[in-house]
Amino acid sequence: LLSTDIDTIVNVGASIEGCRKTLNLAKQYKNIYAAIGVHPDDYDKLNEDIISWLKEEALSNPKVVAIGEIGLDYYYDEPERAVQLKWFERQLQMAVEVNKPVIIHSREACADTINILKNGNADRIGGIIHCYSYTKESVKTFYDMNFYFGIGGVLTFKNARKLVEAAEVIPMERILLETDCPYLAPVPNRGKRNDSSNIRYVIEKLAEIKKCTPEEIVRAT
């Protein structure tokens, strides 16, 4: 990656073990920073001891720049929604306490995500709606809570009409290009392992949507 134009990486934890690996990478490489948090897929392994550990790392480690990936995933409804709501709220509370922005995973859970963010004072810290997948009508709600919109390879897919419509109305200064490595590689590499070198394809598609040059996208994002 260092042979490309990528010079700084925020590696995002999702599982407890993933957070440990992310912290080790951030310690090993000066250009890698860490986001730590537990994804809804792993909420059944979460407890207050883990929350305390995450909080201590966020407070004491200057290379921890965000809390995430946290949120809700109702696509499979596992674990059950009550469990997801509990640990999303708890991790958001912790993020506000340590004053770190959040990286939000939200899949088919727009209303509950918005309610928790509003009730949890997420506007104080802001963050990113990772892999934004909701409508253009929801953009203003997240925007008003100081969130950025993560856009990656999905933007290049043929069935991405809803995301294209949202991208049209998201202000350029609130778009954050992301990889979601190793998933969701953009066309023409869809189905292959994704990495940050593929961001150029997202840039090209976004420039087409925004009717500007790729260079303008790079400068803005």
What are these regions, as identified by a protein language model?
Residues 1-221:
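Mid-domain alpha/beta scaffold segments of enzyme catalytic cores
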